[in-house]
Amino acid sequence: MSERSSDYSEPRPQQPHPWTLLTTMHSSAPRWPGALRAALALYVPGLICLALGYEQHMLLLAAGVFSVIYGEGQPYRTRWRYILISGALLTAGVMTGNAVGHVVWGHIDSGGTMWWLSLTAALTTLFGLLGTFVQNALLLPPPGVFFIIMVTGGASMSARGGLTPWDVGQWAAFGVFSGLVFGMSAYFINPHGPEESAVQNLCDAVGDFEDSPSIAGNHRAQTALANAWSVLASAGIINGGRIIRPELSHLVERTQKARIELVRINASSGVIPVSDELSDSPALVDPSRAAIPLARPEVRSRINRSLTWNSHAVVTAQRVAFAGIVSAVIGIALGFDRPDWAVVSAVIMLQWGPERIPGMVRGIQRMFGSIVGIGIFALLHHFEVGGFWMLTVLAIGQFGAEIFVVKNYALTVIFTTPIALMMGSSSAQDIGHVVTSRTIEVLLAVLASVAVLWFLRPKAEARYHSFVANNCRNAMGALLGALLVTTPRRALPERRDLQYELLTERRTIMTLSANHPLIAEEVWQRHQQMQRTGYMLLDYCHGRGHDEASLDDLSNLAAEVRLLLDD
């Protein structure tokens, strides 16, 4: 089956208007069930804390409960791993942050310089650098490293209250356990609920796009398609381009039908797809492909692919580290005591490696959300909210964070800012100082982040696209070599690698088109030729199955690949 016509021509991506970037809800999926679980995961054990007289420990509990957000949307087959891995990182973060806080505040309270706070800045920046690299190399979904850095920085302030790393670690682990229980609870009601929800969300997104064609609607539908395939693969329903669990084949059929509708609507509406930059969910998918996608390469392979100086993951990590440390150092020099706040602000703006204009829009969202969130905290501080009502506020914050974490930055930050300030013991400080210093720290981080987007390694995208294009050619050669000695079915690893390289090349040229349109114009025809040739190889393998390739076929395929090498 030919999945792309030989004269297929992909249009250059449209660039959304900044107002669209500012106001768009990036996902139409209903998130209230997961948000309710996140709130209850904090509320129920929080009530136990209150009953036992551990009111101040509810904030440490909340640090671990964030783990439930990382598992939402994942099939139950893999959800528990997401919760436990993120929970381990959150717990390690609060323990490390508390340990560093003891060193920092021990010296400062003994008359030492405020520059001891640079240890906190270094810790959160290191976490930001490593987390940003890993999440971009693996193309993980939101929320990424943001919550881990937020609780790590907040825990550095808990040392002033006399809590030890063991104390904060125990309470955070209790929160992780609660998150695991509530995160997996719906399994007993509908074991395949996440898969069904992902496919239904795709159908709804395509339907909404048909009713009202727009760039944002197209992106929501395309992101939903990528998510549906990812969830079906994680659930073990598809693998190797085939249906593995026939009893759930109706979900695959609905996904394919929705994909066909999306391509049809794109053609009839005239809406040209955009790059991934409307949201942080990496939509590594090509809607024009009819075959069931192959799995991504192994974790180690994806990490190794990104261990190059110009890779998206490396450049993004460098920008996060530079913006974070610069804004933190300036904040310390101005006498502010939360350098981690500046680092968190830089991370939330830069952690997914946004293009320039979307990145600036996120800076506006960060400023707006932070100002509103700080204002809410000021009101809570004024009314001296505590006990049951503090728990209620924390639960509402958890609910809102889960609802909006993949939808809109500004709204997410409104809900997370009061929680972060409470974790940092800001309730015991002068409210005027808190409002002023936190606002200025956010402003410093936004300015530093905008600067690195425009001026730190601006040519890296073009170099990385050349690197990825070369990887595509090498992957084609590897697949041809495998077909000489084995069947297409047994050449699955080489087919998987080629598909991944083609999708990565497509994603990188979308970014190149946004940031460097003149360079993208020069290589656009070559990009399309590479995509056509690569998918011609994959289509051939898909049609042959267990049948060995003939030498004549391989000769013809090799001739097409050589055209890329000779160009």
What does each of the following model-derived ranges do?
Residues 306-396:
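Core alpha-helical transmembrane segments of integral membrane proteins
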Residues 97-114, 137-138, 383:
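Transmembrane alpha-helix boundary signature
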Residues 64, 90, 324, 343-349, ...:
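Alpha-helical transmembrane segments of multi-pass membrane proteins
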Residues 1-51, 55, 160-173, 177-341, ...:
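Cytosolic regulatory and coupling regions of membrane transport/channel systems
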Residues 26-30, 74-82, 109-116, 160-164, ...:
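Membrane-helix interfacial "entry" motifs
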Residues 4-7, 28-37, 56-62, 112-123, ...:
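Hydrophobic alpha-helical transmembrane segments
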Residues 84-106, 360-378:
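Membrane-helix boundary elements
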Residues 10-20, 38-46, 50, 54-76, ...:
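Pore- and pathway-forming membrane helices of multi-pass small-molecule/ion transporters and channels
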